[in-house]
Curated annotation (Swiss-Prot):
Keywords: Disulfide bond, Glycoprotein, Secreted, Signal. It comes from Homo sapiens (Human). Glycans are attached at residue 71. Detected in ovary and spinal cord. GO terms for cellular component: extracellular space. The keyword Chaperone does not apply. Belongs to the IGFL family. It comes from the Eukaryota. Homodimer; disulfide-linked. It holds the Pfam family IGFL. Residues 1-24 form the signal peptide. The lineage of its organism: Eukaryota, Metazoa, Chordata, Craniata, Vertebrata. GO terms for molecular function: signaling receptor binding. This is Insulin growth factor-like family member 1.
Length: 110
């Protein structure tokens, strides 16, 4: 292939990939298979967009979902409730780990 043909082929591949991966209006897939270039994760048997939802207790929930932990409110997608100490920790921290500046101590509700 001539150098000019290579340039045209590379340009065509670039244009097609940009078209397939463009972030236009969202389109719901007609099949259970994922569309190319869409960031999706799985929660049980359902797929979800991690930019809008998370998987909490085997259910797809919005990122803004909150629950109570004692007298505190925590964001289930980013924090967790340690019920035996009524402490809210970041989701990736172990409830048994030492207290950090990110932790919130909550009182139990009687």
């Amino acid at each position: 292939m001539a150098p000019r043909g290579c340039i045209v082929a590379v340009f065509a591949i670039f244009c097609i990939s940009r078209l397939l991966c463009s972030h236009g209006a969202p389109v719901a897939p007609m099949t259970p298979y994922l569309m190319l270039c869409q960031p999706h994760k799985r929660c049980g048997d359902k797929f979800y967009d991690p930019l809008q939802h998370c998987c909490y207790d085997d259910a797809v929930v919005p990122l803004a979902r909150t629950q109570t932990c004692g007298n505190c409110t925590f964001r289930v997608c980013f924090e967790q409730c340690c019920p035996w100490t009524f402490m809210v920790k970041l989701i990736n921290q172990n409830c048994d780990s030492a207290r950090t500046s990110d932790d919130r101590l909550c009182r139990s509700v009687s």
